[in-house]
Amino acid sequence: GALALAGCGGVGAPQHIDITLIGFNDLHGNLEPPRQSITVPGALPTERVALPAGGIAHLAGAIATLKARTPHHAVVSAGDLVGASPMVSSLFLDEPTIEAMNQIQIDFNAVGNHEFDRGWRELLRLQHGGCEKFTVREPCQISQPFAGAQFGFLAANVLREDGQTLLPATGLKRFTEGGAQVTVGFIGMTLRSTPSMVTPAGVAGLRFADEADTANAQAAQLRAQGADIIVLALHEGGATTAGATGITEPSCTGPSGDIVPILERLDTAIDVVISGHTHQAYVCDYASVNPQRPFLLTSAGQY
C-alpha cells in the first residue's frame, strides 16, 4: 500500500514536502506469482475490477509506479519478508529474495517472526552478507559471495543478553526540496510472542520486549534526533469488519486482533503504523476508533 505524507518546511521554504510512503508485509519469499488477484474500485461507483497481483514482478512494478509519482519516497516492509518461503527462495536460504529487494531498493524491513526461522545468526548473515554456514543448507549457492541486504533490518524490541538490540532499532530518512527539509523516523519490530513461534535454539540468548513500551521509547528518541514524522513498522496485526474491502474503507470499522491493545498504548508522536502478520488488508484512520490515537493504520495483506 502507499500513502502520502506532508512534512512542513522552514521559514521561506515551501509549505510542505510531499512524500510517498510505500508499505508492504508478509512477502514470505514469494518471488513467483501465486496467480492471485486483488479487487479494486472500477470506473463506476459500483464497479469492482480484479487486478493480477502477487510475486516479485508485480510488486516491483507497483513500487516503481508509485515511486515515479514523486521524487520523495520510502519503501518499508513490516516483516516476514523471508521465511516460510516457496522453494525458489527457501532452497537458497532466501538469498534470492534479499537480492530482489536490493534491486527494488527498499529502505527498511522490520523483522517478523519468520525472519528467525533459521536462527538469529542466519538472520544477521542475511543483513551483513557472507557465506558462513548456520543451517543444513549451503549458503552462497547463487552469488559468491553473498553481499547481504543493502537495506536495513530493524528490530527495536529484540535484545541481546547485554541489553543491546540484535539489529538497529530505528532508521532515519531525510528529504529536501528547495530550502525545506523533512526527516522521517522509522521504528521496526516484531511481535513479542515470536519465541513461541520458532525453534527455541534460534532465539536463544534473546529477549523480546513489549511492543508499545519499546515503540514509545524509540519515538521519543527519534523526536530528539529531529524526526518530523514517525513511522512504526510492526509485525503484528489484526482485522477489520470491512474484510476484503479494507483497502478502500477508511474508518477502521470493528478492529480486532492482538494489535489493538498495542495501538491503544502508542504515543501520539507516532504518525503511521504499518502492520502485518495476519495477512489482512486495511488502510484506515485509527482516530475513527480512538480520537486520542490519530495515526494512519495500514496492512497490505500478503504476497
Locate the predicted segments by residue.
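N-terminal export signals
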Residues: G1-G7
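Acidic, metal/ion-coordinating pockets
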Residues: C8-Y303
